[in-house]
Curated annotation (Swiss-Prot):
Catalyzed reaction equations: GTP + H2O = 7,8-dihydroneopterin 3'-triphosphate + formate + H(+)
One cellular component (GO) term of this entry: cytoplasm
Protein name according to UniProt: GTP cyclohydrolase 1
Binding-site positions, Zn(2+): C93, H96, C164
Transmembrane intervals: none
UniProt entry tagged with the keyword Ligase: no
Subunit: Toroid-shaped homodecamer, composed of two pentamers of five dimers.
GO molecular function: GTP binding; GTP cyclohydrolase I activity; zinc ion binding
Species whose genome carries this gene: Pelagibacter ubique (strain HTCC1062)
Family: Belongs to the GTP cyclohydrolase I family.
Coiled-coil ranges (or none): none
Keywords on record: GTP-binding, Hydrolase, Metal-binding, Nucleotide-binding, One-carbon metabolism, Zinc
Length: 202
């Protein structure tokens, strides 16, 4: 299985550019916008934006594989799908850096071992907190789970609104995008895939 090319398995060195340098860059952007970064209301804005960006894009310093390292084998033979629905997604598109807001559904079929339920949501969060396309985000979550858990199958669905479509450009406020990615049994067996789709539609 070819993994999605990107920073999906790399931890970036965020210290190559200092916070101070990033703050100066935001001051330049404020000036370009026609603002005065020295006025009272904006004095702390560059520092606040840098702090916010560390939260928005914290996924560049996190490793999904490490999150999934701890698994549990005492599942008494459970071999059916595990589905976690309605995981909040907050990301930013890589084209306009506009917010992507929506919901993810994740399922996997364990191969003797399971992972803590919160870890599924954390993997979604790690890849969401990077500049993304929704298609790549969906694939990265699925591939990380499939590889790290050695699962029999993985399914990921994301339903999200892109503010690059709702607030600018075509400005279609009610438009949402749905992406699905299936691996293993979910891809090979349509009955398994359809069962998953029924689960998440309830």
């Amino acid at each position: 299985m070819k993994l999605v090319e990107d920073t999906d398995s790399k931890i970036l060195d965020t210290k190559k550019v200092s916070d101070k340098e990033a703050e100066e860059a935001f001051k330049t952007i404020l000036t370009w916008m026609g603002e005065d970064p020295s006025r009272e209301g904006l004095l702390e804005t560059p520092k606040r934006v840098v702090k916010a960006f560390k939260e928005y894009f914290g996924g560049y310093t996190e490793d999904a594989e490490k999150i999934l390292e701890k698994t549990f084998g005492d599942v008494e033979g459970y071999d059916d799908m595990v589905v976690e629905k309605n995981i909040s997604v907050s990301s930013h598109c890589e084209h306009h850096m506009a917010p992507i807001v929506g919901t993810a559904h994740v399922a996997y079929i364990p191969n003797e071992r399971v992972v803590g339920l919160s870890k599924l949501a954390r993997v979604v969060e790690v890849f969401s907190k990077r500049l993304q396309t929704q298609e790549r985000l969906t694939m990265q979550v699925a591939q990380a789970l499939m590889t790290s858990l050695d699962a029999k199958g993985v399914a990921v669905t994301i339903d999200a609104a892109h503010q690059c479509m709702t607030m600018r450009g075509i400005k279609k406020e009610n438009a949402t995008t749905v992406t699905n990615y299936f691996l293993g049994e979910f891809k090979k067996d349509l009955s398994v895939q359809n069962r998953y789709l029924r689960f998440i539609s309830k």
